[in-house]
Regions:
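Exported/periplasmic cell-wall-interacting domains
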Residues: 203-205, 229, 238-246, 251, ...
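SH3-family beta-barrel domains
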Residues: 20-26, 32-59, 69-72, 110-145, ...
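Solvent-exposed coil/turn segments that connect beta secondary-structure elements
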Residues: 81, 100-102, 177-179, 190, ...
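Boundary regions of SH3-family modules and the immediately adjacent low-complexity/disordered segments
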Residues: 35-40, 95-129, 175-205
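Cell wall/extracellular polymer interaction/catalysis modules
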Residues: 162-243
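SH3/SH3-like beta-barrel superfamily modules
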Residues: 70-109, 152-188
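Solvent-exposed, polar/charged alpha-helical surfaces in well-ordered, non-transmembrane soluble domains
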Residues: 68-71, 95, 217, 308-315
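N-terminal secretory signal peptides
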Residues: 1-14, 21-24, 35-36
Length: 339
């Protein structure tokens, strides 16, 4: 797995060759070279969450004996990663669990980390990230507690206050930025994100720009003509969903509830992390928790990437966003070229 390389020593051809040949890993994680390793080094994953109901097999091949299936949101131990079936070509990675072999495309890499609750929330709220496989939220009204969304690992949310429930559990109140409702979730399931964690990367970088290659399903970030970062992506499933052309990062949000009620195009995704919009139609670069199927068209038009990669892009691109701000616009943001 290639995590960090010294880009200053690489030509563009070398960089792309390395990126394409990166040894396989659960996330095919491609990360920036040098600089800021404490904040950018990817976490180590040894558990996963099944995004859908998934079959597992005797061998890392769908042609081998089927042993059973996991229902949606099963959390499984990952004992080994291996190249299995050559198809699908974009992702031949299989995961060994205690029960059998599972294809990785719809297994979200997760951790299970509990956190010390913050009892006093700053005025205006606090950005926080889910650090458990998922956390059940609740909507409280005059009829009692109603089950709300599941907040999934690596999703981000705005915490507005803390309170202690009647049983002693400490809860965060989360403001939903789509419908305006307030949901509550166990506080120890979310990790506060501090200012140091999202400080701008290379703020003095010269002529920053991003290339989104639809054919190769890869994003490359440049400073002038020097590649500084690359990651696999998943763009629009249908031709034209992710439009070709030249754009700029014009709006940024660290968290966004994305949803559509269009027939045949329904989705409802709270807490989408590290969103960089490049068009007022809603096309954006952002982190993803509802699949792990990078390297092939997959989305409704947005440019999906791992949460870790999206966070790096969010920090590197202009406009820069203060940690206590939930929305920034700019007419001179980082250039994005979709080819």
């Amino acid at each position: 797995m290639i995590n960090f390389v010294m880009a200053s020593r690489l030509t563009r051809r070398d960089f792309l060759k390395l990126a394409g040949a990166a040894a396989v890993g659960f996330g095919f994680r491609d990360f920036p070279p040098g600089g800021d390793p404490a904040n950018n080094r990817p976490p180590s994953f040894n558990i996963g969450r099944t995004v859908y109901s998934l079959r597992y097999y005797e061998q890392p091949s769908s042609s081998s004996k089927e042993l059973g299936f996991y229902v949606t949101d099963t959390v499984v131990d990952i004992l080994e990663e291996r190249v299995g079936d050559p198809e699908p070509e974009h992702n031949p990675i299989w995961l060994r669990t205690p029960d059998g072999w599972l294809h990785s495309s719809y297994v979200q890499p997760v951790q299970n980390q509990l956190n010390e609750p913050v009892m006093k929330i700053p005025a205006g709220g606090m950005l926080a990230e889910v650090t458990v496989p998922y956390s059940q939220s609740w909507l409280i009204n005059d009829r009692g507690w109603k089950r709300g969304y599941k907040y999934y690992y690596a999703s981000t949310h705005w915490v507005m206050r803390t309170f202690v429930g009647s049983t002693g559990i400490i809860w965060y109140s989360i403001l939903d930025d789509r419908g305006g409702e307030t949901y509550v979730v166990e506080a120890e399931h979310l990790r506060p994100i501090g200012a140091a964690e999202i400080t701008p990367i290379s703020p003095d970088g010269v002529n920053k720009w991003i290339q989104v290659d639809l054919g190769k399903q890869r994003l490359i970030a440049f400073e002038a003509n020097r590649p500084v970062f690359t990651t696999r992506i998943a763009t629009g499933y249908f031709e034209g969903d992710t439009p070709l052309g030249e754009y700029r990062v014009e709006r940024k949000q660290p968290s966004r509830h994305m949803a559509s009620d269009s027939i045949g195009n329904e989705f409802d995704l709270p807490g989408v992390p590290w969103v960089c919009y490049i068009a007022w139609t809603g096309v954006s670069l952002h982190g993803t928790y509802w699949h792990h199927n990078y390297g092939t068209p997959q989305s409704h038009g947005c440019i999906n990437m791992t949460p870790e990669a999206a966070k790096w892009i969010y920090r590197w691109t202009e406009p820069f966003v203060p940690v206590d701000d939930d929305y920034v616009e700019s007419e001179t943001g980082t250039r994005v070229v979709v080819i």
